A protein has these predicted regions:
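Structural motif
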Residues: 26-28, 95-102, 145-152, 226-230
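Acidic carboxylate motifs that coordinate Ca2+ or other divalent cations, activating on Asp/Glu
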Residues: 81
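Beta-propeller blade repeat segments, especially FG-GAP/WD-type strand-to-loop junctions
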Residues: 33-36, 96-116, 150-157
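A low-complexity, Ser/Thr/Gly/Pro-enriched, surface-exposed linker/loop concept
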Residues: 48-60, 229-257
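Hydrophobic beta-strand segments that make up the repeating blades of beta-propeller
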Residues: 86-90
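Acidic, small-residue rich beta-repeat scaffolds with periodic aromatic anchors
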Residues: 1-40, 130-204
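N-terminal secretory signal peptides
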Residues: 12-14, 199-245
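Beta-propeller blade termini
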Residues: 2-5, 67-78, 123-136
Length: 258
């Protein structure tokens, strides 16, 4: 079945084909047309498209980032040149089976496929978000419940350029690692902060004492009654050393037995 997508532009309209409308998703294609000339401007094949009707119609420009409903066609200015571009869904190929898009930038000669912008809509979690006021594009990617990365980009020479990223990593609970990277005008500068959450539900018991001479705390703790760990924190509460560094569910170097 083929549906027309309209109402998002005075210049353009879209068409989308679903091979099977009895399913929530199916393969198909998405096309963009010039309203005056009826010329087909963009065609994108998709291995999977979401079939969401609103009052019997398909709507454009719905983007519930990162995992909510997404239209198969988005029409927005992505490179901040004052001209609206197109994001066309080509499946659910982003992280955790999230929607993925191909990006076509407006030019003097029509719409041109952008590999660099498309990667931002393929390799992360869903479609990227756009802050028009500050001219920033943002992406998010994750691995399970305990690792997330948030990145910001500006646009230079019609290409996205990474200017900052923030990563939080709690995969080795109760050790938490925060990593920030910022562009200083010449290079990316990385800052890493490591802390310990003694209130973690995984810590069954801990013992802490202070060493005045070096102004540091020594912490011994037990995770899930499996192993004895220790950590050294400085006067700012940052972890300078912890041992062992492996997950508590890997083979321990030594055991703690009451």
């Amino acid at each position: 079945a083929t549906f027309k997508i309209d109402g998002f532009s005075k210049q353009y309209y879209g068409k989308v084909y679903f091979s099977d409308t009895t399913e929530i998703t199916s393969d198909g294609w998405v096309e963009v047309y010039d309203r005056v000339t009826e010329k087909k401007l963009i065609h994108v094949d998709a291995d999977e498209l979401s079939f969401n009707l609103h009052d019997g119609e398909l709507k454009a420009h719905i983007a519930e980032i990162p995992y909510g409903e997404h239209s198969v066609l988005l029409h927005e200015d992505y490179n901040f040149d004052g001209k609206k571009d197109f994001a066309i869904m080509d499946g659910f190929n982003s992280c955790y089976h999230g929607p993925s898009f191909q990006i076509y930038l407006a030019s003097k000669n029509g719409f041109v496929y952008s590999d660099s912008f498309t990667r931002l809509a393929q390799d992360y979690c869903g479609m990227f978000s756009v802050d028009h006021e500050n001219e920033i594009i943002s992406t998010m990617v994750k691995s399970g419940c305990c690792w997330h990365q948030f990145s910001n980009y500006i646009v230079e020479n019609n290409e996205p350029k990474l200017v900052s990223s923030y990563t939080d990593d709690s995969q080795n609970d109760p050790i938490y690692i925060e990593r920030t990277e910022e562009w200083d005008g010449k290079k990316m500068v990385e800052t890493v902060s490591t802390s310990i959450e003694l209130e973690s539900e995984n810590i069954k018991e801990y013992f802490k004492f202070h060493v005045d001479k070096v102004n540091k705390d020594i912490i011994l703790y037990n995770i899930n009654d499996r192993m004895l760990y220790y950590a050294i924190t400085n006067d700012k509460g940052n972890v300078e050393l912890y041992y062992p560094v492996d997950s508590p569910y890997q083979s321990p170097d030594f055991k703690y037995d009451k």
